[in-house]
Every structure is written in C-alpha cells, then in structure tokens.
C-alpha cells in the first residue's frame, strides 16, 4: 500500500478553529458568501453567525466579495470556483433530504456534522429527528452559538458528541436513535479525513444500523497518493499562500487528509453491500446548476469528486 503522510494522529481531537475543525469554518464561510450573493444557489442564514463567532479573521471570509484577496485575479478565480462547488454540493444534499422527507423517512443522521445547519434551516416534516455526530468541542461551539442567537431547530435536534473512530453507534442509540426505523444518513466532506480502513468500518456500521428503505448520501473523492504527492501538495500550498497571509491562518488542508491506494471506491463498496447507488460527477452537477467549472481546475483543487445517494433495499431512488 502506498500513501502520503498526514499530520494527523490516531487519537487526535479538535475544536472549531483547530485541525479538521477549521475546515468546517471554511465550508460554512463559503455557504455564507454564497448566501450573500445577488442570486444565491442556496441560502444558509446561520452560516455567517457560525463563522463570525470564531473571530474577525474568519468573519471576513464569509462575505460576498473576497476583498482580502486584493487584486489577485487568479486567487479570486479559485475562490469563486470553491464557493460555487460548495454551493452545488450543499444544493445536492439539500435536495436529497427533501426527497427522503417526501419518502416518509423521519430519522436523519449527519456524520461529522461540523457547522451544518440543516436541522435549523430546512423545512422538516413533523416528527423528524436530526442527529448530528461530531467531536464534542465542535458541537459545543455550534450549539452555544446558535443558542446565543435564539436559533430554533425545525426538527427535533439531537447533537451526539462522539468520535467516528470509536463506538459511535452506541452513543447514537443512547441518544435515542432507533436502528429499526429507516434512516437518512449523510457523509458530506468527511471521507478524506478518515483512513481507508476507517472509511470501510464507517460504511459497515452504517449498514448494520440501517433498516430496509434507509438512504445514504455521500461525497467521495479520488484520494490516491498520485493525486496528493508532496510536490503537488507544495504547489497547492503555494497557490493558497496569499490567502493564508491575508487571513493570518496557518492551515494546510491537504496535510489533514489521508491518502492510500487501497481506499475503497465508495460507490462500488455500497453497491457490493446491498445499496442501490446513483452517482453524478461534481463537474456535471455544477454544469446542471449553472455553475460550470473546468474539470482541470476542479482536479487541481481537489473538487473533482462524486456526489451520490443510495437506497438499501435496491428500489429505485
């Protein structure tokens, strides 16, 4: 097995401005910036407050115009591609939840939820429970921030502090999850931050805890070592240097990811384990929603992934 090193350790943990936690701030900032556009693809009225509560450095990332990039046209182009990608990804999974709600599923589990605000911003049918699993400090930050601003969930909202590398199903059941009921699962922006064997174990545990008719939506990427060589990582770090200097941040997202040439293809794994999968390349979904981007640009910045949804019992999605 070939792999490129990660700065992560087997038992690492983090708060919202640290390590993987900081990536949740970056994603929420992109949603806030999209929401502030004249014709936004998605609206997340909670994104800005969740980002700005982390401090002014983060808040300036969450506005419509990336003024902090100055006149650097290339940096602005990259920023726009990233914002568009995050908007399209969010839209795809919002549609997924709308579909599963109409299908009658009333139990939702968001894995590594970060600063996801769907429990508060989507219109859930009566009787829906949204469970969110993430690191304790991340969930503490989110719930405290939302409570301080009087945010009211539109479903029964249950944060579950747990590490996805531990026995998280036990924590989920203890919080009220019923594995006998169909569940809608979400793994968005998660898989690159799991070792290959942990990804397999995650899917196995999801399957064990999924009743017939359950659904799952996943964002997957090509995490082979060839894509994340030290040379390519250095090139990507150099491209993002102005952003880090302007924002006074020292975060190397690539170094937080796990790469290995034996990582299972998510769609193939799910198909082989009884799930009926429908998948779309991110470039195709971006084009469909009017936010096209060159595939070479998406590949260079790790956004040439696959968005997929699957149903356990093999019926049409």
Swiss-Prot record:
Q: What is its EC number?
A: 2.1.1.-
Q: Per UniProt, what is one GO molecular function of this protein? A: methyltransferase activity
Pfam families in the record, alphabetically?
A: LCM
Query: What top-level class of enzyme does the UniProt entry assign?
Result: transferase
Query: What InterPro entries does its record include?
Result: Ppm1/Ppm2/Tcmp (IPR007213), SAM-dependent_MTases_sf (IPR029063), SAM_mthyl_Trfase_ML2640-like (IPR011610)
Membrane-traversing stretches: none
Question: GO annotations under biological process?
Answer: methylation
Top-rank taxon: Bacteria
* Family from the record: Belongs to the UPF0677 family.
Protein role: Exhibits S-adenosyl-L-methionine-dependent methyltransferase activity.
PANTHER family given in the database record = S-ADENOSYL-L-METHIONINE-DEPENDENT METHYLTRANSFERASE YKTD-RELATED, S-ADENOSYL-L-METHIONINE-DEPENDENT METHYLTRANSFERASES SUPERFAMILY PROTEIN
Question: What is the protein name for this chain?
Answer: Putative S-adenosyl-L-methionine-dependent methyltransferase MSMEG_0093
